[in-house]
Amino acid sequence: GRLRNMKVKREDKGQSTVIAVAGCVAQAAGAEIIKRAPYVDIVLGPQTYHRLPEMVAKATRAEGGGTHKGILDIEFPEEPKFDHLPKVVAKGASAFLSVQEGCDKFCTFCVVPYTRGAEYSRAVEDVVAEAKTLASGGAKEITLLGQNVNAYHGEKIKGETGSEAGLGYLIRRLAEIDGVE
């Protein structure tokens, strides 16, 4: 296709080009993508976005050596990706905050459990800390993100009774943050 042609033209000029395919569908069809489109350098799923910089570096090194077969990273890593993502600073009155990923419902029409994995919720303490950062940057309205946010069940703040918190608990904690409306 067009990307292959662009890559070949750039390589003819001595310019490196790395093509990555990412997302849920890429995760589900990763091996097939590499097989059908050998010019694709990287295929990764949503759970491994945080590894993209090292995959690009690896693909770039492989291009120089000439024996590159494509990097396929579609597994569910042991470590949560939220620990590896850069901290976001709000640049306006509203901001988005990921609190949950995945789904355990397995509805017949949905691929989320297969491509995003089991439900995983961030700890309340981590969500509140990020929300405070967003509020200090000017965010007054914070939209909580996830595939199934109403199933949120994060670890409570240390020292509080009980071990897990539902969405209502999280919202009450976020409402206590100065500046958040």
Predicted regions mapped to residue ranges:
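Alpha-helix-loop-beta-strand connector modules within alpha/beta enzyme cores
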Residues: 161-181
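Proteins enriched for Cys/Gly/acidic motifs involved in redox and nucleic-acid/cofactor modification
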Residues: 1-153, 174
